[in-house]
Amino acid sequence: MSNIKSTQDSSHNAVARSSSASFAASEESFTGITHDKDEQSDTPADKLTKMLTGPARDTASQISATVSEMAPDVVSKVESFADALSRHTTRSGAFNMDSDSDDGFDAHAIFESFVRDADEQGIHIRKAGVTIEDVSAKGVDASALEGATFGNILCLPLTIFKGIKAKRHQKMRQIISNVNALAEAGEMILVLGRPGAGCSSFLKVTAGEIDQFAGGVSGEVAYDGIPQEEMMKRYKADVIYNGELDVHFPYLTVKQTLDFAIACKTPALRVNNVSKKEYIASRRDLYATIFGLRHTYNTKVGNDFVRGVSGGERKRVSIAEALAAKGSIYCWDNATRGLDASTALEYAKAIRIMTNLLKSTAFVTIYQASENIYETFDKVTVLYSGKQIYFGLIHEAKPYFAKMGYLCPPRQATAEFLTALTDPNGFHLIKPGYENKVPRTAEEFETYWLNSPEFAQMKKDIAAYKEKVNTEKTKEVYDESMAQEKSKYTRKKSYYTVSYWEQVKLCTQRGFQRIYGNKSYTVINVCSAIIQSFITGSLFYNTPSSTSGAFSRGGVLYFALLYYSLMGLANISFEHRPILQKHKGYSLYHPSAEAIGSTLASFPFRMIGLTCFFIILFFLSGLHRTAGSFFTIYLFLTMCSEAINGLFEMVSSVCDTLSQANSISGILMMSISMYSTYMIQLPSMHPWFKWISYVLPIRYAFESMLNAEFHGRHMDCANTLVPSGGDYDNLSDDYKVCAFVGSKPGQSYVLGDDYLKNQFQYVYKHTWRNFGILWCFLLGYVVLKVIFTEYKRPVKGGGDALIFKKGSKRFIAHADEESPDNVNDIDAKEQFSSESSGANDEVFDDLEAKGVFIWKDVCFTIPYEGGKRMLLDNVSGYCIPGTMTALMGESGAGKTTLLNTLAQRNVGIITGDMLVNGRPIDASFERRTGYVQQQDIHIAELTVRESLQFSARMRRPQHLPDSEKMDYVEKIIRVLGMEEYAEALVGEVGCGLNVEQRKKLSIGVELVAKPDLLLFLDEPTSGLDSQSSWAIIQLLRKLSKAGQSILCTIHQPSATLFEEFDRLLLLRKGGQTVYFGDIGKNSATILNYFERNGARKCDSSENPAEYILEAIGAGATASVKEDWHEKWLNSVEFEQTKEKVQDLINDLSKQETKSEVGDKPSKYATSYAYQFRYVLIRTSTSFWRSLNYIMSKMMLMLVGGLYIGFTFFNVGKSYVGLQNAMFAAFISIILSAPAMNQIQGRAIASRELFEVRESQSNMFHWSLVLITQYLSELPYHLFFSTIFFVSSYFPLRIFFEASRSAVYFLNYCIMFQLYYVGLGLMILYMSPNLPSANVILGLCLSFMLSFCGVTQPVSLMPGFWTFMWKASPYTYFVQNLVGIMLHKKPVVCKKKELNYFNPPNGSTCGEYMKPFLEKATGYIENPDATSDCAYCIYEVGDNYLTHISSKYSYLWRNFGIFWIYIFFNIIAMVCVYYLFHVRQSSFLSPVSILNKIKNIRKKKQ
């Protein structure tokens, strides 16, 4: 250590000596970036040095350009600069640096110059230490949670009573207990513990994320003396919690994601007064260079379902985004998950740099920390079942436990050793004589710690630090620094950096980027609007200007409003809410700013569709073709569309789940449909619901649009003069009346204003008053949405609570435990993970090797930016039964790509040979191999045991006894240590199994299939601690010893774990092989290869896995001069591998293959009928336990039924009553829209699970996903439609006789449910994603509703479209429902519905009308009168049926037609899924069409 400088003065002197002249002259400066000292021109290194250390500072853009110019050399030096800065801070906070180092890129001087510049220019850098004293946190006791089912609804009163009782007597449990810590500014604290130890909870408490702890948090957390409550109120932006999961907007690129985060934190006062643009670019390039993301700038971030960057790169994006938040205190929760060993080390070094130079404070949990990573930290704390068992300097931890009696095994990393102590079933090396003295349980460890001198010293250090810090000074620095950073219009007390309107601007810009990134949704939206406008416009083509077209004109305008109301349903989305919560935690922007920004960004795209829609519809339908009318209707349609869209978005902002939002939106949709005043006019509304029309924007828009259309219009009476025909035509019009609303005796026309006043109570002077009202609605909804979004608290979560199957023994056992002492005091995210995690004594003696898997010269190429990109480059290898092959390489090297290619899961240009026993793979390959994916995707409502049982039944041969399969499942449960939670529901992330338990389940699902060829595993230890990882690898070793072939990618193996593998395939970026061959005992074989080919000698204390990754230049920023791929191609080992591969092919191809009896080379292991049985059971079970989904469905039907029933209560016998009966049936059908949205939201999860995991393993036939989903939906729809029938039909008070009621029930509750469930699923299964399905569904519904004869009578339809009236299934449902209600129903017109006229002198009304009534419908109310004859147009309900082109006699004909549509939906559902997802035909995709057009243009150019 004599050559290490540790004082601040020496560091400053070193920087001062780094002038541009000495830098250029020094032979040691920028080693590896060689140049002739006599050259006249400056090298890039010289330029950069002058910029940073010369008297005149250059701008960030010039620096960035210069770094780019020298990038090939500079990047190769970043790792060495990280090493230099990865020394420990001393008590004084200075960093250490080797003075003899010949590192070329003097990063310390560069970073120090920035810090010095900030100091010279008076720019403060915030920093604070953290003191944690006796902190405890309580949560709901998750050990006795029971999953709810549909049975809870059937016993609703008892369920409500139990819920109230449970709420009052809610059991709490200790999550963390009496934790203490001290982190001075500039220190890094490593938090160790197994999953479930409370590490995540400790970090959340430290970061102030305490809302989720139902039992509250006690103790004291302070930041340089500032209490946590005050810190969260005034300086929340400085405390950052970075969660374990990577949630991002998938359609944004990496560059856009980072730019946005940096822009939100761009200070007003910047070093050297660089511009905002330059600041953002330089920061982004800095983070991207450190984490190796520059090559991904233009790649989408993606997620589990949207292709983007790799999982490791996505994790690095998360880290860079968190750093962009510019916190002074960071809490990193398992931030190295998914990173390879080299990149994980670089991450730790990067955090070390930030703490050294910026004096930030970091708390980090890492489940698999290598010795190199461990040594970058200052202090370490160890948690065991929520209890703290050590806190202190890292080099004192091992001696502390050695004094206790525990010894660290040779070559075991210190972090691994410390974590292993908290595993009661793990292997522990104990000093002789201490076997009965060492602590074993969490309580014993805690007692030892509390009585230790180390604990007493820690308490003294905390007390001394609290005395030392100047809290007021810290506040002053924070206030001054934040004032310097805040932009001009940011509130003084706000902890956000940029002003609110700047946040809105940035969120709007990001909204445009998101929409552009997801082109398919936008294209589908606009195209559907254009298609619908052509169809509807042609349906109402040249609507007559006479009275016969008045109702149709209203129908055109109503349809336009209804269509964009339905489109508003598609805007309900919850997938981005976790991202919003994360960014809120980072203090990037107000959630309300995103609410406004997303609205503003989507508005232009909505306007494009709406404008195209309206222009086509307006001119085709023949509306009032004046400029005033055109622009007025367009304006009000736009205002109403935006207002209703705001209404639905407001609803989604206040709801917790998608099902809740869909249910409420469904009720609102019915209200919008009914109370627009088109279906039921104001005079006909009942007083208890009439107020609804006044609180919805559509009523005001519809009034103004009708006024614009009918004001000043003279409508001739067409075919409605009464009486007419025969001798009546010779009489004067003085003896006739126009049988139309608003008519006057003796007039052959009706004024538009009179029609509106009498029919709707509308007056023209309200037109522009309504404009103001609509503005109020629009602004009101937006304001409410903004408020709800800003202050909406997330659903309490973060700690995964286990939920047991109802009635399970495990649940009953825990529920009976009264004493709190019996409750495991461990983190809710893993209550039972620490139990039974050690090595299990189960033996696999029944695995028999079935073949050798060989791949030779495998290449994989994909289209990329108009060209091709090779992801795998002539990779060869083999897997022999009884061996384990590790697949390693840095993130993005192609490990997962190779695994997917070998497992037949990639689609692209694949060349090379993949053989089993020397022969090409057959149809049974996928099901005879197991594949454990990185993504842990499962059915949330199944238990662990049920998930395993289903996999075993589907993937093992059918001829095997079921008892044998189930016994093997139980064996796997024991081997994986899952007995304690085998009856627990899988659940969702945050409420169910935790990361480790999900990973074990993913492995178990493949193991129970007992693959007899090969087991692929993609990062099986990702997210697990070292002990769980060891247990998993030991399990794989047992499988290999029993004859299993295993190929496994692995990121961060310890030395002991790495040496468990027999063979290694090492890849570098570009999918190029660097090594394939044996590892050897103590890694001797592979180390010999690398040392012999030019790598430095590996020290005996080093981890061989990290050593070889370092040697080949793996990592985000590392680089080496040697071309290890070229060395491999020229090596003896490569020739031996080629020979071995060819020998295996030659020898094995001559042998006869052995196959298990009954195990034919078929695609599936079981028959279709067998699959159908168990897939249906699984899907039905999932539905039965989905209480939230079922409750949402029930509320939609129940409330919807009551709503319709009491809106049209007692329709009566009047003319309006006839219309109301028809509209009641029409609205009942419209209710299917939100119901289908619910169906699609539910079904998409099962589709994604099948496509991502189950289809890849050939578990069962793809059609069963569709069919079982359909069959499982039906019982609930039949049940809840019965509730709807009772609550809607009988309040109408039409006919109560059983025959009519039964027929109505048959049509609506059975036939209609069978129809629309299939329709909703069919549309979903043809769509690329859920939002697109919602749009297409809206298009189809509006299409069918338009042609069912309600809004436009068939008599007025153009001849071309009458076939669509016949083709629309809703036509026949409306005919039957209305026919049942109106058949033989007598009509008695109300006084205002009668048409009055005078007969000729000397005639009574009856005598005068007798000839007319013999041919026409209706009746005279006063036949003996001689004046003011009162005529009613209908006499019986069947007259009205005839008017709408329907007859009661069509009832059973239509019933047969229903079956045709039902079967068509089912067949079409299967066919479209096969076309678009099995065959993956993409030629119909709008984006594919656009891309093909672009490619054609490029070729022409």
From Swiss-Prot:
Compartment list: Membrane
Residue sites binding ATP per the record: 889-896
Glycosylated position list: 273, 334, 518, 730, 874, 1401
GO molecular function: ABC-type xenobiotic transporter activity; ATP binding; ATP hydrolysis activity
Chief place where the protein resides: membrane
Biased composition range(s): Low complexity: 18-30
Bilayer disposition of the protein: Multi-pass membrane protein
Modified sites of kind N-acetylserine: 2
Highest taxon in the source lineage: Eukaryota
Gene Ontology biological process terms from the UniProt entry: intracellular monoatomic cation homeostasis; xenobiotic detoxification by transmembrane export across the plasma membrane
Stretches the record annotates as Disordered: 1-56
CC terms in the record's Gene Ontology section: cell periphery; mitochondrion; plasma membrane
Family of this protein: Belongs to the ABC transporter superfamily. ABCG family. PDR (TC 3.A.1.205) subfamily.
Protein name: Protein SNQ2
Name of encoding gene: SNQ2
